[in-house]
């Protein structure tokens, strides 16, 4: 991957490039961003730039032998560690690892901005918990015991280290603190608080923000043939998550406004029979649609807050959405909105970790009923 394929993030890109030019590259770096931030693409572009044999001022050349391999994710001096579900079955261990590495490379090509759930769906492990096993830490140590094959540098990319088994995390502490010469660790995470403090203390943190709405809009305008009103709505719902924006384009026109209005009406009335039925309906949705509904709900909460504050110039709702917000703001105080947002965030977290959608949405509905009324 090249820096030029990643929209926005100008300051972070410049900092990474300058570190290579000045030869001040921290041996262990943690690319930290919320889910939806482009921290994995940045780490990949940084790795490509490190290996590039004909570096430009602002990007790798894309044509040298090293770049050709890096852009296919097959450079021999770039190693990957990533979460996997236990779907090996009776396959030989080496064969299974080879198959998963091949799938990983194809995933990066097809879904360069993908999330963890996209990855587990890609290789067929969506129904099982993905982890980085103890064997993963042994693989790191084995790989780094070898000298670089073609490049001056050797890079170990660890995606989602928060999913490391505790024994795996402890297993890499020594080599993380004292890596072999010209060896770099790039850890890519959404949840630094779930990492061992001893790992955090050994890394330089690179903060990767979500994209701004104009950056997402510019990318979609260049890459997708969309009617402007629909594009703006997608940008608003995506909230800086480019991967989510792309998925929204591929999905059918949603009916979230109608669904969310009915849901909040049932919460307000404390109509528990209706809420049970809605939880059943939400359970039948695919994971993308479930997540989309929660994102939409949080968007409506934000718009309601803006309406209450009188910030009509930045309130983006129109039509039926605006009417809903005008009515909703009569019963929702700032503290209620904050609490509802927190509850939706927690529900999204549990959905991402394969909790029962029916139980998650039913519990959320009951708690929202208590907040709203």
Give names to the regions the model predicted.
Residues 1-51, 55-58, 65-69, 181-184, ...:
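Charged, glycine-rich active-site and insertion segments that engage polyanionic ligands
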Residues 2-163, 167:
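Clamp-loader machinery-focused feature within the broader ASCE/P-loop NTPase space
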Residues 155-159, 172, 183-189:
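Structural recognition of the conserved hydrophobic beta-strand(s) that form the central parallel beta-sheet
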Residues 166-170, 291:
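Conserved strand-to-helix beginnings and helix N-cap segments that scaffold or border functional pockets
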């Amino acid at each position: 991957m090249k820096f030029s394929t990643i929209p926005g993030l100008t300051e972070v890109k410049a900092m990474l490039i300058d570190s290579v030019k000045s030869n001040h590259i921290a041996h262990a770096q943690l690319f930290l961003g919320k889910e939806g931030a482009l921290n994995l693409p940045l780490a990949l572009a940084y790795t490509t730039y490190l290996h590039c044999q004909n570096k430009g001022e602002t990007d790798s050349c894309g044509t040298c032998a090293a770049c050709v391999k890096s852009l296919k994710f097959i450079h021999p001096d770039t190693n990957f560690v990533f979460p996997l579900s236990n779907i090996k079955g009776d396959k030989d261990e080496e064969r299974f690892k080879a198959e998963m590495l091949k799938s990983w490379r194809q995933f990066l090509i097809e879904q360069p901005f993908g999330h963890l759930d996209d990855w587990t769906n890609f290789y067929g492990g969506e129904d099982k918990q993905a982890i980085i096993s103890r064997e993963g830490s042994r693989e790191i140590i084995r790989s780094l015991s070898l000298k670089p094959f073609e490049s001056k540098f050797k890079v170990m990319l660890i995606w989602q280290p928060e999913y490391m088994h505790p024994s795996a995390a402890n297993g890499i502490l020594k080599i993380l603190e004292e890596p072999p010469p010209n060896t770099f660790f790039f850890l890519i995470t959404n949840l630094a608080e779930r990492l061992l403090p001893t790992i955090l203390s050994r890394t330089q943190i690179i903060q990767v923000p979500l994209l701004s709405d104009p950056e997402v809009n510019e990318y979609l305008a260049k890459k997708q043939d969309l009617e402007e009103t629909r594009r703006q709505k997608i940008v608003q719902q995506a909230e800086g998550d480019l991967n989510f924006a792309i998925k929204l384009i591929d999905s059918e026109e949603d009916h979230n406004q109608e669904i969310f209005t009915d849901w909040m009406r049932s919460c307000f009335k404390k109509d528990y029979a209706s809420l049970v039925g809605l939880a059943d309906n939400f359970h039948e949705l695919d994971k993308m649609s479930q997540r989309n509904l929660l994102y939409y709900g949080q968007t409506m909460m934000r718009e309601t807050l803006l309406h209450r504050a009188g910030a009509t110039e930045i309130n983006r709702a129109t039509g039926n959405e605006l009417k809903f917000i005008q009515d909703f703001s009569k019963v929702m105080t700032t503290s209620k909105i904050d609490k509802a947002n927190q509850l939706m965030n927690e529900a999204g977290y549990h959905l991402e970790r394969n909790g029962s959608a029916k139980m998650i949405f039913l519990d959320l509905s009951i708690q929202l009923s208590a907040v709203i009324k």
